[in-house]
Every structure is written in C-alpha cells, then in structure tokens.
Amino acid sequence: MSAANPETPNSTISREANTQSSSAATSQGYVLPEGKIMPNTVFVGGIDVRMDETEIRGFFARYGSVKEVKIITDRTGVSKGYGFVSFFNDVDVQKIVESQINFHGKKLKLGPAIRKQNLCAYHVQPRPLVFNHPPPPQFQNVWSNPNTETYMHPPTTMNPVTQYVQAYPPYPNSPVQVITGYQLPVYNYQMPPQWPVGEQRSYVVPPAYSSVNYYCNEIDPGAEVVPNECSVCEATPPSGNGPQKKSVDRSIQTVVSCLFNPENSRLRNSVVTQDDYFRDKRVHHFRRSRAVLKSV
C-alpha cells in the first residue's frame, strides 16, 4: 500500500512551497512582495535590540531543529529589528506564521521568507534611486527676439578705453544678470582762439598739402640769407584815440621774409618750400592790415 503512493522529500517541499505561495499575500494582513519563497525559513520582525541570536534560537527550537538565526544589522552593527530563522527539517511554516508569539512582552511579526535579487526580504521592496539632475544653466540674448531659442552667451569683451558698465537688475524670470559695456565716443573739437575785445587778428591756416617746392628766379643762389624780424600791427578800437599797439612776432623769422624786403632784391634763384610760402602770405596779410589802419 505504501509502495503505491511513494512520497519523496522533493514532492513534499514543492507542495509546501505552493501552499506558502498561495497564502503569502494574506499573511497576518500584510501584503508580501513578489519573489521566491524560501522553504523552511521564517521571517521574524519586531525584534528588540536587547534580543540576541541565542535567545531567538532557543525560543524557536520548539517548532523544529533550528539551522540558523540571522539578525539583520546596519553598517555600524546595530540591529534593524528583523531577521530570519531557518530549520533543518520540514516544518509547517504557515502554522508558525499564524500563531501569536509574544517574546519579552513584545509581539513578533512573522511571515514567510521571500528571496528577491539574491536578498531575503519580507516587506521591504528595493526601489532604484532616481536623481533628478538640475538642467544646465541657459542664457538668453536680451537683444534678440524672445521667441528665439536660448543659447550659451559668450563672455562680453570689454574695451579698455573709456568704458561705462551698467548692470541691470535681474528680472523675476531672468536666469542670470547681464552686464553690458558701452563705449563713449571721443570727439575732438578744435576751438578758435578767443581774443580780447578790440583786437583783430587774422591768420590763414594752411590745409594739409603734399610737399611742393616753389622756385623764384629773382634770387641769387650765392647770396647769404639773413633772418629778419617782421613787426605785427594790431588794430585798435575805432572809438579810442590811444596810440597803436605794436608787437614783434619772433616766430616769423624765415627766409621768405627777406624775399619781399626791398633791401634784399639782389637774391635770385633760391628754393622756397611750402611752409615758407604760406608764412610769406601771412606777412603780406599783416602788412596789408597795417596799410588799411593807417589810411583809416
């Protein structure tokens, strides 16, 4: 009779595993995670820090021969409050789970041991940690259309000459503060000289010409050139009866001043430069002004 219904240990373990798997979802009202149920192993939760493995082994020895007691601890060696008890022989794990066990005045939380990702766990399901990295900072060109796409703004190159830096306060929706450099244009003004009232001075400022040589056939190339001082007459107010002011302009001591002097009419075939030519015209202007004042 017994040979007709042989029962092997493997068939017993599979039947027990199927029984535990069917009742795992309702063990003491807790929702168990999915995974492989370890046979002959009980999850024990609610372990007090004062309990050690020896006491737990002695307590569960009444249900069968205890193979191993494992209390889960952290890196510092402190108990996390749960562990596992495994047996050598086949035990009724469901009967142990359904029993109300109080140890040292504290109720233990029992359940089937479930292995997931090579770790034994009861009610803790590992979840991957997701880190939300902040987006890279983006800068928007304040001079372009706001509807255009954003891009990385290059560093502003500042001119070292005459800079004015104006910092705009950041707007509520603006990610960064933009500093814009302005360069003030430099203007060069040439103001005419201011003379006192009553004095009239007329000077001819020559434009920038290229170097031009003027030749005079009335100059003797072998004659000696002697600088001469030309007197400059300054006009006086027509209403005044005071004497005329005379001053000597020593800046006009050129070779050209001797060309139009009657005493030096013997000079011939001398070369006259551009600067001498315009200074000569200035001497003629002074002399003509003096002649007009004398006639008045």
UniProtKB/Swiss-Prot annotation:
Location, primary (coarse class): cytoplasm
Statement: the UniProt record of this protein carries the keyword Cell division: no
Domain (RRM) ranges: 40-115
Tissue expression per record: Testis specific.
Location of region: Disordered: 1-25
Compartmental location: Cytoplasm; Nucleus
Bias kind Polar residues: ranges: 1-18
Keywords noted in UniProt: Cytoplasm, Developmental protein, Differentiation, Nucleus, Phosphoprotein, RNA-binding, Spermatogenesis, Translation regulation
Gene Ontology MF annotations: mRNA 3'-UTR binding; translation activator activity
Domain DAZ: 167-190
Highest taxon listed in the record's lineage: Eukaryota
Pfam families noted in UniProt: Daz, RRM_1
Region named Homodimerization: 80-132
GO annotations of cellular component type: cytoplasm; nucleus
SUPFAM superfamilies for the chain: RNA-binding domain, RBD
Modified residues (Phosphotyrosine): Y277
Alphabetical list of InterPro entries matching this protein: DAZ_dom, DAZ_RRM_vert, Nucleotide-bd_a/b_plait_sf, RBD_domain_sf, RRM_dom
One GO BP: cell differentiation
Quaternary data: Homodimer and heterodimer. Forms a heterodimer with DAZ. Interacts with BOLL, DAZAP1 and DAZAP2. Interacts with PUM2 Multiple DAZL RRMs can bind to a single RNA containing multiple GUU triplets.
Function of the protein: RNA-binding protein, which is essential for gametogenesis in both males and females. Plays a central role during spermatogenesis. Acts by binding to the 3'-UTR of mRNA, specifically recognizing GUU triplets, and thereby regulating the translation of key transcripts.
Entry comment, domain topic: The DAZ domain mediates the interaction with DAZAP1 and DAZAP2.
Similarity field: Belongs to the RRM DAZ family.
Name of protein: Deleted in azoospermia-like
Organism: Callithrix jacchus (White-tufted-ear marmoset)
